[in-house]
Structures are given as C-alpha cells and as structure tokens.
C-alpha cells in the first residue's frame, strides 16, 4: 500500500529495558543495524501492524511488552535513488512511519529473531538510548533523531520511576553531544521534573 505521495505506511518499534537501553537489531547477512520496522497491510491499523511485526521480527507477544507511547506524527524518509524500483507502479519513494515505544516486561530470552522462514534480522544487542541516532544508515538518521528526542521526553521526564538509574546519564549524554544538542532535556530540566 503506497499513498498518493509515494510513501509506504510503516511502523517502527523501539523496545527498551529497565536500564534505559534499546534493542538494536542486525539485518540478515549484513553489517547493518536498525530498529525493527515493517509495512502496514490493507485493513490493518498501525497498532495491529506493530504487534504483528513485533512477533515476526523479534519473536515477542503483546504480553511480553508494555506500550509506553506512540509518536504524535507520521515521520517520513526518502529512499536513496539506488534503492528505488523505477519499474514498479506505483513507485515507492520512501516510508512514512508511526513509531511505538515499548518496554520489555518479560525475560529477554523470549527474544527470537528466527520466527519466520525469511527473518529480517540475525542478531541483536542492547545499546545506549542515543546510540542508534549516530549509527543508523544516513537516510534514516533524521527520523531516528526526531523519534528518540520525542521518546526521551517520555522516558526521562514524565515517567520518573521507569529508569531511575539511567535518567541523568542519558540526559547528560544528549546535552553534551553538540551534534544533537537541539533539546531542552538538560540536567536542570531533569531536577526540575523531580521537584528539586
């Protein structure tokens, strides 16, 4: 399903643990890492697509996670010209994505990248919250920056009990990195949110 502007509706999934780390997945046979994502089928809601992709790509069921937040807007990225399929009609020029923030509430042993005959990923690891913004393929980087900034406002400001150990470290890291310093989540904001 491709919209009138040439974008394919898609969901992206950020899974975090109680340490404030996020699940980073390795694409099969490549040295390329990303968050799980996938297309939305006809007659399927974004949330339904997210749970389907969660099982197909990561092997998790709805009971294994807690839905914390959904991005407010669709975020778009264009595919590089080398990846465009000019012979397909309609032609897809990129993805428009609704992003979901999940917290793993079951044992990480339930994570299984091999649940389908054609798995997307062949490995995974936990990484620091901001790591994916710098490491993802360049044409997805702007979307990742926007997603993680929006999700940080939920994890590190509104929910003080979720990641108490990692809150200040994550905020200081984000604030110190000049390349991604367009944020208000400073140490002062952190203490203000705690009433100090």
UniProtKB/Swiss-Prot annotation:
GO biological process, one term: mRNA catabolic process
Residue ranges constituting the Nudix hydrolase domain according to the UniProt record: 6-149
Cofactor(s) required for function per UniProt: a divalent metal cation
UniProt keyword Transferase present: no
Leading EC class: hydrolase
Keyword check for Transmembrane: no
Stretch forming the signal peptide: none
Motif Nudix box, chain ranges: 38-59
EC number: 3.6.1.-
CDD domains: NUDIX_Ap4A_hydrolase_plant_like
Single GO term (MF): mRNA 5'-diphosphatase activity
GO cellular component: cytoplasm
Keywords from the named record: Hydrolase
PROSITE patterns with a match to the protein in the record: NUDIX, NUDIX_BOX
Function according to Swiss-Prot or TrEMBL: Accelerates the degradation of transcripts by removing pyrophosphate from the 5'-end of triphosphorylated RNA, leading to a more labile monophosphorylated state that can stimulate subsequent ribonuclease cleavage.
Xref: PANTHER family: M7GPPPN-MRNA HYDROLASE (PTHR23114:SF17)
The protein, known as: RNA pyrophosphohydrolase
Species of provenance: Haemophilus influenzae (strain PittEE)
Gene transcribed to yield this protein: rppH
